[in-house]
Amino acid sequence: MHHHKKLSYAALGLGILFLSFIIIKEEPWNPFQLLEPKALADVITDPTQPQPLIISVGPAGLIKGAIEANPAKDKENLEKLRTRLSQESKTRQVVIYCGCCPFKDCPNIRPAFSLLNQMGFKNHKLLNLTQNLKVNWIDKGYPMN
């Protein structure tokens, strides 16, 4: 009996490990595709830098130079985004953000980022707004439109 219990704990541990691996694997971006807010703010405020295409895929407000694509959770908005992106070179630096809430709760970033993956973009990033646009961008005094 005692031995059996140990075994089931081991199996449970493996199960949890496996589950967390699946959850991590599921995101359409990898850690290298997360762009820190400060890094983007530095580029935006430096006219000598090539400017990325910044796309807001949520309702949170426009970062300086960003274009509004409306919430990507809606199919119609996602199709408009596809049309807009089809005019860009696949090597264009693209930064998407939502900023409505933490990533785990956000309905907009996954469809938008997955679209960039599917379309074969090579230099696309997700702005790493860990909480929201207000806390991670506006409150830090980074530039807005």
Label every model-predicted segment:
Residues 82-134:
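Catalytic cysteine-centered active loop of the rhodanese-like fold, especially the PTP/DSP P-loop
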Residues 28-31, 67-71, 99-103:
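Second-shell loop/turn segments in exported
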Residues 62-76:
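Acidic/glycine-enriched edge-of-secondary-structure segments
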